[in-house]
């Protein structure tokens, strides 16, 4: 699988929430006391707001969690922290039932529960000729955290909007095995050299051998022959391709299509033209084809 490109990632920041570190206030004062706590409902890789009620909350507090990172105490409206009401934010980095530990004065002041659902992304696909619908992709950050975070950064920046599935990979016997896209803006043609791929972010480390496999309807990262070269391009396995788990160092699976598998099948059956041109080093000229009309990704959003 071949991929290229580089676009600066636009990670969402928590506007209005400033300050630094996990604590604030004066060390050595009265021990902080937490009498109540709550959180908002946060999705994976988004901002969790933690609200603490009690006394002496302007003293030094330390917040930690196995499922949230980069704790910040808020001092800016509308979340202005005080001695009796404190607000902290962090970016969720785990899924399931999790906790935040609040410590101060050498003791644990509170344990705050929160939960994060398995993240999902919805792709809107349309070729303008009857093949259209939504693909809901459930992501697996437990096994492939770097790959999932990379994919979500592209999704949140709008990078995938109006890109295409440009390559329908087929074997020498013309059996479809992958549908690859996410690197080229529409339109592309089987008779004209592809334009340059969209500029993408820096390549990421390869995450393989972590319990996920290139089975039918799974989603994986395309890359060059260099192991740590994946950027934006993805591919859907349209058949079981377990050989790709180890072939050439393996290809990183990081999710699967959990709603819309019939659409994947329709994409496989959509019109596709062999190309006489060598678009990129991932194209096998004699078997691979370009879906025409283009199978366009009209939108990509994190929906859970």
Where are these regions (language model features)?
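Bacterial N-terminal signal peptides that target proteins for export
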Residues: 1-9
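C-terminal motif of bacterial Sec signal peptides marking the signal peptidase cleavage site
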Residues: 16-19
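Cyclophilin-like peptidyl-prolyl cis-trans isomerases
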Residues: 21-304
């Amino acid at each position: 699988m071949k991929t290229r490109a580089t676009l600066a990632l636009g990670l969402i920041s928590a506007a209005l929430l400033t300050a630094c570190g996990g604590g604030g206030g004066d060390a050595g004062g009265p021990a902080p006391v937490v009498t109540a706590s709550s959180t908002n409902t946060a999705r994976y890789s988004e901002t969790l707001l933690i609200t603490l009620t009690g006394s002496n909350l302007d003293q030094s507090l330390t917040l930690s969690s196995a499922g949230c990172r980069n704790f910040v105490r808020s001092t800016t409206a509308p979340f202005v922290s005080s001695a009796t009401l404190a607000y902290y934010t962090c970016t969720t980095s785990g899924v399931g039932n999790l906790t935040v530990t609040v410590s101060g004065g050498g003791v644990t002041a509170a344990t705050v529960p929160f939960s994060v659902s398995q993240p999902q992304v919805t792709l809107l696909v349309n070729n303008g000729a009857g093949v259209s619908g939504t693909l809901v992709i459930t992501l697996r950050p437990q096994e492939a955290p770097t790959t999932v975070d990379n994919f979500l950064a592209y999704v949140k920046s709008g990078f995938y909007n109006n890109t295409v599935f440009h390559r329908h990979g087929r074997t020498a016997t013309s059996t479809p095995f992958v549908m690859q896209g996410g690197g080229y803006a529409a339109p592309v043609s089987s008779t004209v050299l592809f334009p340059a791929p969209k500029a993408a972010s820096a390549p990421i480390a390869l995450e393989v051998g972590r319990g996920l496999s290139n089975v039918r309807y799974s989603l994986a990262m395309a890359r060059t022959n260099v192991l740590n070269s994946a950027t934006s391009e993805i591919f859907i396995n349209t058949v079981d391709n377990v050989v790709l788990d180890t072939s050439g160092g393996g290809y990183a699976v990081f999710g699967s299509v959990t709603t819309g598998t019939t659409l994947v099948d329709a994409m496989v059956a959509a019109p596709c033209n062999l190309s006489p041109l060598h678009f990129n080093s991932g194209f096998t000229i004699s078997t691979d084809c370009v879906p025409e009309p283009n199978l366009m990704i009209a939108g990509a959003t994190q929906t859970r």
